[in-house]
Amino acid sequence: VGSEMCIRDRYEALYLDRLLITQAPAIALGNAKKELVHLASYAIQSLEASYAFFAKGDEKYYDKVEKYETAVNSIDEELTTYLIDISNESLSVSENEVLASVLDSVRDLERIGDLAVASANLSQHIHNKGIEFSDTAKAELADVYNRTHRIALDSIRVVVDDDKVLAGQVILRHEELKKLEKQLRKTHTKRLNNGECTAQAGINYVDYLSHYTRIADHAINLVEKVTEGVI
């Protein structure tokens, strides 16, 4: 997850065998969970490319974000349809719980992809307008990104391995990130008041903070499904 993948012109699901829906819905549900991880790999790569575009300003990273977003949307649509079709079959109570959780998780991953795109669009605006961040602001955003990225990667590991120990660690790191965000908003307001950064850069800084922390929030939703034993 999260490593550079070959970007094809056409994106499609890998694990959604439609014959299994009626013949073996429980196995189809297991395949849907595998597809969820495939979807996650594109959402996280979109996040990585989005940050690279912010940090380096090279348009090739913006193009990657757009391609990964195409993949996320395509797989999201296919996987959602697959899950809805499975829900029409006879499933046990626990299988129905898992199905609902996978469906929720698809939405969370789709939102992570959307927020990565929003960050890339923000970066494009900043590069086009020549808006500059201070070195301190850049270092703070790099820290928030790295924490968010690690939470996102580990959230998928938690799902794949059903790792409740790692889940607990990730939840603690998410709490730390929320505290850091509050602290950064305060120190940033002081910078603005002291005239150390422009109002426009100030607004954009807060937007980045918001995008990254919301991505972490969506990743944590997946982790909590594991701690609740419903995925």
Question: What does each of the following model-derived ranges do?
Answer:
Residues 1-3, 8-231:
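Cytosolic, long alpha-helical scaffolding segments
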